[in-house]
Each structure stands twice: as structure tokens, then as C-alpha cells.
Amino acid sequence: MSRNLMDQDFGSEEEDDDFNPAPAEESDNEEAHHDKTRKPDRDSDARNGSDDEGADEAGEEDEEENEEGGEGEGDEEEDEEEDEDDDDVSKPRKRRKGHGGLSAFIDYEAGVDEEEDEVEDEEEEEGYGLEQHPDDVLPAGAETDDRQHRRLDRERELAATLDAEKQAQLLKERYGRNRAAATDAVIVPKRLLLPSVDDPSIWGVRCKAGKEREVVFSIQKRIEDRPPGSRNPIKIISAFERGGAMSGYIYVEARRQADVMDALQDMSNVYPRTKMILVPVKEMPDLLRVQKSEELNPGGWVRIKRGKYMNDLAQIEEVETNGLAVTVRLVPRLDYGMNEDSGAPIMDPKRKRPGANPAVARPPQRLFSEAEAKKKHSKYLTATAGLGAKSWNYLGETYIDGFLIKDMKVQHLITKNVNPRLEEVTMFARDSENGTSNLDLASLAETLKNSTAEESYLPGDPVEVFKGEQQGLVGRTSSTRGDIVTILVTEGELAGQTIEAPVKTLRKRFREGDHVKVIGGSRYQDELGMVVQVRDDTVTLLSDMSMQEITVFSKDLRLSAETGVDGKLGMFDVHDLVQLDAATVACIVKVDRESLRVLDQNGSIRTILPSQVTNKITPRRDAVATDRNGAEIRHGDTVREVYGEQRSGVILHIHRSFLFIHNKAQAENAGIVVVRTTNVVTVSAKGGRPTGPDLSKMNPALMRNGAPGGMMAPPPSKTFGRDRLLGKTVLVKKGPFKGLLGIVKDTTDVQARVELHSKNKLVTIPKELLVVKDPVTGQTIDIGRGRGGPRVPQNSAAPSSGWQGGRTPMAAADSSRTPAWGAAMSSRTPAWSGAGLGSRTPAWKADGSRTAYGGAGSRTPAWNAGARTPYGGGFGSGSGNSDFDAFAAGSRTPAWGAASGSRTPAWSASANTTSRNDNKAYDAPTPGATYSAPTPGAYGGAPTPGLSAPTPGAWADSAPTPGAYNAPTPADFGEGSRPYDAPTPAMGGAAATPGAGAYGDTDDGAPRYEEGTPSP
């Protein structure tokens, strides 16, 4: 043990600096010198080693004696032999220690005399206590000789003083190649790398949309099957696709078009036979330009493009190695089966139901709750193993800590201009152990800088550079170009100079006490307040409206000189319509510094705080309501109260059945009055829109129709109030729903919402395509023919509905039908029974001397008021308002008009009794005689029973009945000459009897007789 310790070389103190000294170069003499100095060391080591070994062997012998017991007791000879053996063993061991190198592996055996042993023993005894330290035998000055160390230090200092260029030169000389490479060191300009006409052409080939990538892979596989050097190689150079807006085409690079045709021959989803597009040389670089993809990092923010989570904010959890897919964490939207349709057919949950749009009606954002999921979908809920987090699997999706963990493709995400709002990001803050939420504002601010748009910085905004080479510069923006902002430095050594900085390195700079306005990106938009604290990218301000502190990002603020007291409080202004609760709205009538004074829909005034307002209702300029008379009222119309104070004003807001109007004559409540729509009438409409009744109906001159040269009837005026089409059963005449029946549920001016019987669905159909039908009989009902025709004669039946009149044959018991057999009504031709009245031709009893007439009998021709022929009414003194009363009345057969029930046959006439003075213009008698159609005679007169038997005399000088053209009887009350008066009893020049204007201008109803008129 002592020998090993003494053999170690601890070195000098100067050797501490270097543990790996370079090997020293020594000569042969130095080796000999070292051998001489080492020899006494070896002898001393051998002696020390022998003593130690002897002591150890003695101990071993004692142990052996104890173990062997009494086997060797008293045997002294054996002990002596063992001692001799020990001495023999120790001697060669002592000599082996002295040899180094290869001699350590060679055994030396030599005979030793006892004399030599005795001499050695004597030497050992003499040298006991005179042992020397190894350093004692070193030459003088050897312990201070550190030349090798100093030389190594000089080499290191020299290497440290060399600069990088010299070190690179030394390394190049030592390790560089001896031969120069055959390369061209000339720099080629990029413009010379652009394609030219000598390069291969690029052809655009039509393919099936969405199959571009598959076609390119098919081309690649075909090239592998027919490589260059084969019997029939593919001669194209490359093929690629661009997708997106350039879908439907693949692009093949080749020398000839024939090579492209050969490469794409008999390949599916591609159409090489169609016209190929040769890409111009100038457009080739744009076609091959690669757009740099957005780098996504865990912790960043993205938005979802489509589906139920469209435009929802999500946080990136993990990015795949290929960069094509990411794992995101977002707040789920679940209804836990509350809105499920139990009657819906069982379908694959992954397949979409037809007509269902999950983005239209989607549940609100809430963290996942296993308690809610267990209520209805317990069988779809399973707990999964997680690393200390609550992990659930619900309906095939994973939820951890209440968040949805979802794998999505990058193309389904919005990675640019995400602009996460602070309230959105707050939902992603995980709660720590002490109950506080830990929100990483640094990563959020970094995302906001990456998505900061150039419109966020306007000229004049105070900004500062917070990172980069220009960090610390303060100035104001002067212009923006893309993501580069030009800044005019206002502080520091560069004051007055203009520099450019990227948007990512800028942030807006505010000081405490600045008055700012929130411009966007936060739910506090349009808030005004004073800055009270600035911390990095977040600014805390005291709102002028709520007197509460709010924290927003500096990019969402802008210096503002506005105040929240002068007529406006933040986002609220006078005359704004606000929502107080689910059933109450109010209009702001006064704005104080910290409160709002509003007039609610019930007419009560209340003072509220801005925080009590649920939301501000955007004014609806297209809102429509109806007043007391059913007239349409809109925003901006002037209305007046019917009852009460009869106040008037301009409509500001329409909310359900309430109107908020502004009365300039009222000073209180800022002139705002709230009334119900049923208590107002329209005074004037905005923009001159007609709202009242059509005044043209009140002008008799405009209502005259039928006379030659007279005005045509005006188009039917717009009706107000409830539409008569509502609730009616209708039939669709044309279109995709032709032939289907339905009920009208709602109408507009030109369209109707019809609930179809067959499909049980609501469709919108134009009104002109609908026909009203009777729900029982299926007959067509005409509800749009105005106010109907004249009254039915007294001797006819009660008026029938508009769709029943004037049909032939018809067995119903009312008038205006031919033939009729069993009715007790008159005015039928021919008829065999009745009330015994005249007016039948031929008639066989009771006043049979009369010519057919549609009304009461005893006419033809007579002087009294009840015997005028022709006339459509049953009154003896009736008169018409038209020049064409004579021919438009009910004395003709056939006729179509709705004047009376005495026409045969007619297709659409009706015997309505609305007004006997309302005649139809331009009656079209059938078979088509001009103005009248005598039966059975022809044009020019209506002799009865025929042209050959005039009554009461011959044709030339007699008075045929009803007369040539017409016999206007009775006359109207002196409205001037009639162009078609029928002179009686002769055809020329005599006074008409009882012609038009027979009564003159008087109104007493008595006949007037002139000279030349025969007496009755």
C-alpha cells in the first residue's frame, strides 16, 4: 500500500493548469539518465515490498494452522521448508518488480546460493531506517524545471492571437484538397434563370375537378413502368397541379404536345383529347411560384373555417411533423341531446341529415360537463385514462379539462388575421391550484402581432419599437404599406428622421392620463376612458361610462378627444333604441355622465345605468306596420293619434306593435312619444308613397266607361286591411307545383305563402299563379272581379255567388240559366212553368202578348214606367248611368256581363245584387253581333219571332222591337244626345219614343210626349 502511494507522481503546482501535456521529446542519454536514477528506487521498493509480503504471509500461516487443527503440530521440519519456499517465492517477485516493459511478462529463474541470501539479509538490516524519498534522488533543480509547461503555454497563446481568417487558412492548408474543383464561380443573374422559348413548354390539360393529385400520381406510376431507356419511354419532363382556384387542370412539361398525348393516353379522370392550354412563357414563373406556408407553433391561436365550430377560436396543442395536421383545443358546443328529434329516422351519426345546417342553430360555447352528458347520453360517455387531468370520451370525441381536443387539417383552419379577443382567450385560461386563472398573455400578444393588420396603424398614432435593432425608438406613424410602417421619430438622437419598421416589432404607446377610445377587437368597442396603467401590450383604462376599469390590448385603442357626457355616453346616444330585458325595450331620451334616462314601451320614464342595458337594437329601416285603417306605415312616416291627446310626429322606431315617434312640438322627453300602431292613422308617407284610398274612384268622370272615346277603366286599386286571399283554398295553375291544392297562410302584394295539402310544406307562389277553389265542390271562385254587377230582377231568385252565375245548363233554382225546367222564377227562355208571369216567348198563358224580356212582364212597348223594353232590372222607373244602358242591359241573349240574370247562355255572368247601376264596360255579346245579339235574328234589329214577322208591322216603316241597334229605354235623365237612339215608330228623323233623353233634364220620372208620337 505504501509502495503504491509513493510511486504516484503528484507533479508541481504549475501543472494544475494542464491535465493533458504534450509528450516531451527526449534523447537516448536522457533515457539512460532516468534509468540510473530509477534503480535505487526499484531496490528500495523491492525491500519494502518483501517486508510487507513477509508479514502478510506470516498471518496467512497462522490462519492455516488454526484451520488445520493439530495436523501439523510439532512438525518443525515442515515449517522450515515452508519458510524456505516463501523466501524463494519472494525473491523472484522482488526481481520482477524491477523490470518494465516486456520483461514483466518473462519469468526469470536462477539458482541462488545461501551466501547471496545472507548478503542480502545483511544489506537489508543495514538499510533499515535509511530509506529515501523519490524526490531526494532527483538532480539539482529538476523540481523547478517547467520548460515543457512554458512551451505549451506559448503555443496556446499563439493560437489564441491568430484571427479567424488565419485559422481558416491553416485548416484549409491542413485538411483542404490539393486539386481545384472544376466549377464556375461566376454569379448568374436571376433574370437569366427565367424560362425562355428554348425551354420545354407547359401544357394545361383538363381533368376531373378534385382528382388532380390522383392524375399526377398515375403519371408518376406510368413513368416508373416506362422509364427512360425502355422500349417506349415517357417523354414528358414533369407534371404538377396547383389546386384551389386552378382546380380542374393539371400541368405537364414537355417538348411536344404529342408527348403529352402519349403520356396521358387511356388514363382515367383526365381528358387529353380536349383543347389543351399552352401556358405562355411570361406566365410560367407565376405558375411555378411557391407560396410560403404559415408556420404553426404550439400555443398559437387559429380559427375554424367550417362546420359547427365555424369562426370559433382554437388553441394549437400539437403540430404534426409533416405540418399538414394539428391538434387543437377549443371550447365545445354541445346540447347533450336536448334538441334531438326522437321521431327522426335512425341514421349514421357521421352522415349529415338532408337540409340540416349545423352552423345555423348551434349550441352556445360551454365547457364540457359530464353531469349533463350522463342525463341522456350515459351510454355514450366513458372515462379515459389521463395524466392527472379529467379526460372523457363523449360521442366519439375526447374532452380534457372541459375542452374539446380535436385533430384537424391545416387547410380547415384560419391561420392569418385571427385577431383573438381578450374575452375569447379568457375562456381558455386554465385554473391553477390556488383558484386563479393562468393566462399566457405573452403568447397571445405574439399572436396578435402576427395578425395585426395594416389598418390598425393610422397616421398620427404614437408607437414604439419594442424589439429588433431599432428597439426603444418612439415616434408617430406617417404611412403604412403592407406590413411595413413608416415612423417619424419624435424622441432621442434620431428625432426628426423617418425610419421603416415591420408591424411585428411595433406597439402603440400610451401614457397614463391619455383619453382613449376602444376601436375594435373587443367587446368594449366604442368605450371611452382614461388610461390608468400600461403594462407591455395591455392597457387598463377607467371607462367614462361605467366608471370601472377595463383591460384591453394597446392595438385596440386610439387617442380620442371625445367625451362620454356631451350628448353621447360611450356607445349610447339620444334616440337610440335599447333592450332592457327580454320583453321590454326603451328609447333613450337623456344621457348623463354615468346614467341613461329612457322611455320604455309602456310609457314610463326610468333612469338606468349603462350596465343594465342588455344590448343596443340596430335601427331597422325596412320595418313595416299597419295603422288603424290597415294602411302600411314605415320608418319616417308622419302619423297622428286617433284617441287621447292626438299627438303627431315622425316615426323613429317600430318595435312589434309599438311606435316611438318624435314630436317637435313637445319639449319633454326629448320629443319622444310611444304609441300603439292601432291608435294612429297615417298623415303623410315618406317619399310620397300612397297610403290612403284611391281618390280616382270618387271622380264620376274617371269612373265612366264603355262610351266610345271614353276612358278605360283604371287598374284595380290596392286593397288595404286583411287580404281576402288569406285562408282560401287555392290551386296552382303553373310552375313546379302545378295542380296542387293548398291553403293561403300569408300574403304580400304580389306573393302568397301556401301550405300544400300533399307535401305538408309552405311554399311561396306568385298570386297570379293561384286560382281560388271551393273546398267542398271544387268549383272556381272569382274573388277579384270588383264590386259585382247590377241587382237581380225582383222576380229572380236570391243572388248567387260569383262563381255560379250564368252557366248553361244548370239545374239550380236561380235565374240566368237556360234551359231551366222547374224553377219558380221568370226570365227563362224557353220555359213551361213558372209563376204565371209573362216575358216568355213563346208563352201559352198569362199575358202572352209580350215579347221576351228578362225582367218583370207587361213591357213591349208601353207608355207607363213599368213597360220599357229593354232594361235589365225589374223596376219600372230604373235608369242607367251609361250611354250604353240600352245594349249593355239584360235584354240580350246571349251576353256575358254580370248585369242581370236574363242572358242565355253566358260563361261567366253572375246575378249579383251589389249595385244595379254598376255596369261592365265593353260587354261582349255572343254570338258576336255588334253591341247587341238579338235572338234568333241577326244584326240590325231584333224582330220577334223573326225577321219575316215583324211586330207590330212591316220592317221598313214599323217599329221593330227591340229596335235597330238598340232601344235605349228607359232613358237616363237628360245627359245629352245618344249616338244609337232608335227612333220609333219610323226610322228617320222622328222623336225617339221612348228614346234616350225622352224625359229631358227633369227628374220627376214622368214621360214627355211630343208631336208625332203615337199614343198608346
From Swiss-Prot:
Keywords: mRNA processing, Nucleus, Transcription. Residues 30-50, 1005-1016 have a biased composition (Basic and acidic residues). The keyword Flavoprotein does not apply. It holds the Pfam family KOW5_SPT5. Residues 10-29, 51-88, 110-128 have a biased composition (Acidic residues). GO terms for biological process: mRNA processing; regulation of DNA-templated transcription elongation; regulation of transcription by RNA polymerase II; transcription elongation by RNA polymerase II; transcription elongation-coupled chromatin remodeling. It is found in: Nucleus. Gene3D superfamilies: 2.30.30.30, NusG, N-terminal domain (3.30.70.940). GO terms for molecular function: mRNA binding. GO terms for cellular component: DSIF complex. Residues 1-149, 341-363, 780-865, 894-1016 are annotated as: Disordered. InterPro entries: KOW, KOW_Spt5_1, KOW_Spt5_2, KOW_Spt5_3, KOW_Spt5_4, KOW_Spt5_5, NGN-domain, NGN-like_dom. Residues 793-802, 901-916 have a biased composition (Polar residues). Residues 933-946, 981-1000 have a biased composition (Low complexity). The keyword Metal-binding does not apply. It comes from the Eukaryota. The spt4-spt5 complex mediates both activation and inhibition of transcription elongation, and plays a role in pre-mRNA processing. This complex seems to be important for the stability of the RNA polymerase II elongation machinery on the chromatin template but not for the inherent ability of this machinery to translocate down the gene. PANTHER family: SUPPRESSOR OF TY 5, TRANSCRIPTION ELONGATION FACTOR SPT5. Component of the spt4-spt5 complex. Interacts with RNA polymerase II. Belongs to the SPT5 family. This is Transcription elongation factor spt5. It comes from Emericella nidulans (strain FGSC A4 / ATCC 38163 / CBS 112.46 / NRRL 194 / M139) (Aspergillus nidulans). The lineage of its organism: Eukaryota, Fungi, Dikarya, Ascomycota, Pezizomycotina.
